[in-house]
């Protein structure tokens, strides 16, 4: 007997959550901890030396980058997100030698990002890459890089599992940075005087 519409919807929800869980499980089995440590150390060192950090990307990778920049800013870092397409329209003026740019791309072969990698090198900035393609120049030609494995996307094309992997990677980097810089809750709250942060409820 064919499944009802309600059953199909419920199965889709359960299937999606199961796939998300498996995606993170596979991510943890394949990630390289030393890559994460290297990027976190470079971002922390960038702050120590008074340099700026820029995060860039396109599409959903850009959205992940925006969240990372906002979170780092809340912790007192000079971090700014710049959409990949905007660099060649004047945003390059932000850069000074020694600044860092973290480039995020799931495919690792975006034409805009490939062009920017050459541009950033000529500007003598430190480049870091995050992508899901091991052969990508974002992993092989940057000063530091993180491979972000992910499972099959929704409908084989909608960014879903790749976004979960990227967000997990960002959380791991942020956690390592907090440990390196000995950051505490008060450091975050100092930049949130509105005191509107929500504390998790007890289960």
Predicted regions and their residues:
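Short amphipathic alpha-helical segments, especially helix-boundary/capping motifs
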Residues: 1-2, 13-19, 93-94, 147-152
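An N-terminal, well-structured beta->alpha segment
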Residues: 2-49
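Generic secondary-structure signature for well-ordered alpha-helical cores
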Residues: 22, 26-33, 48, 77, ...
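Glycine-rich phosphate-binding loops that contact phosphosugars or nucleotide phosphates
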Residues: 44, 52-181
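Glycine-rich phosphate/diphosphate-binding loops and the adjacent beta-loop-alpha structural elements
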Residues: 48-58, 196-203
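Internal, active-site/partner-interface "lid" segment
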Residues: 137-140, 179-203
């Amino acid at each position: 007997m064919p499944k009802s519409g309600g059953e199909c919807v419920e199965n889709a929800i359960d299937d999606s959550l199961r796939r998300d869980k498996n995606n993170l499980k596979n991510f943890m089995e394949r990630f390289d901890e030393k890559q994460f440590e290297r990027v976190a150390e470079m971002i922390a060192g960038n702050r120590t030396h008074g340099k700026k950090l820029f995060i860039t990307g396109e599409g959903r990778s850009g959205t992940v980058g925006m969240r990372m920049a906002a979170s780092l800013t809340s912790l007192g870092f000079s971090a700014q997100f710049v959409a990949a397409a905007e660099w060649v329209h004047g945003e390059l003026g932000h850069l000074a030698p020694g600044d860092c740019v973290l480039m995020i791309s799931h495919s690792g072969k975006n034409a805009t990002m490939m062009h920017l990698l050459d541009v950033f090198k000529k500007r003598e900035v430190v480049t870091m890459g995050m992508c899901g393609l091991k052969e990508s120049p974002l992993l092989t030609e940057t000063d530091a890089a993180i491979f972000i494995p992910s499972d099959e996307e929704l409908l084989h094309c909608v960014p879903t599992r790749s976004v979960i992997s990227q967000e997990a990677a960002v959380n791991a980097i942020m956690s390592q940075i907090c440990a390196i810089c000995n950051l505490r809750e008060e450091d975050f709250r100092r930049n949130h005087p509105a005191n509107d942060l929500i504390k998790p409820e007890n289960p």
